[in-house]
Amino acid sequence: MGMRALLAGSAVLLAGVVACSSAGAATAAPAAAGASRIAKVAASGSATAKASTAGSATPATVTEGLCTGPYARRALSAQLSADIYTGLRGRNGVHAVSLYDQGTGVSCLDNGSKHFDSASIVKAIIMAALLRWHQETKTPLSSWEKSEANEMITESNNDAATDLWDEIGMDNLQDFLNLAGMGGTQLGQDGEWGLTQVTAHDELLLLKLLTAPNSVLDAYSRSYQLGLMAQVTSSESWGVTAGTPSGVSWHVKNGWLPDASGWHINSIGTFSGHSANYMIAVLSDNADMNNDEQYGINTIEDVARPVQRDLNNATLTGSSTAAARLAAAPNVAETLATSWAVVPALPTPAQG
């Protein structure tokens, strides 16, 4: 992505929250040392728990630092939170992280409502809005649109992004954001699509729309966009893909933009295969021109590598017992399917 002057010419965070039917008070397990400690329920609490049924001694969900998930996955939540903190420790600038793992139900959010210049990750929004527009008009993508979309996503071509941004129009782009529930996202004005203001919370909502059945994007649209995101040129496939194990497929869109304050480096992606099904978004403002583009990329990858390790280790550990758990509690499968429609609780993002 070039300088701002070039731009003028050119995902649901699932918080793992389960509705409680309890009429009684929530209880908390004792605290234990280490990353696998069970959070106490407290007014100040850095960790909270919610009872799944009235009088139940076992909380349904537990929050550990930045991450929330099922009680049985509290160690994973704690490990992910610790690894995110470690990855960002000592790094210059401002950062935001969001992730969701469908297999374990664990989600994490750091600085979720902070606004960042989108740079080229807005191209994923442009693509999704184009596909939604064709769903509404019941028309197929033209050969020209397919060519432009391919260049925009796989090569991050700015001219193609400008062409499609102009074709869709601001009204249709905003309509898509409204349908997606991406209320914190503010479209760039005067054609400056790369200055669209995005949040880690909303980027996860977008990734959610691309990876599970929903009323906004149909199966064809989801498959088409993910197919393009899986073909991003190797020179632009850095970021949240770092540490992806063999056998797991990635679908990514990155963005990079320098200005007087420093480099803006963003990376969003979804991952599937070998029972894996998760998504990660990392946004960053370096806020120091002494730090180059690679510094921002390194920051994102310092977060992505341990997160990839944690999630894939959890998938391998849990896959052998998943069938037995679902057979013993068939309502769990229903909960996983319907939970995708839940918009996570988050304070209204500050407008900036």
Residue ranges and their predicted role:
Residues 17-53, 72, 316, 322:
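C-terminal region of N-terminal signal peptides and the immediate post-cleavage residues
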Residues 55, 59-95, 100-104, 164-352:
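Penicillin-recognizing serine hydrolase domain
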Residues 110-116, 189-192:
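A short glycine/serine-rich beta->alpha loop
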Residues 150-152, 180:
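Short helix- or helix-capping micro-motifs
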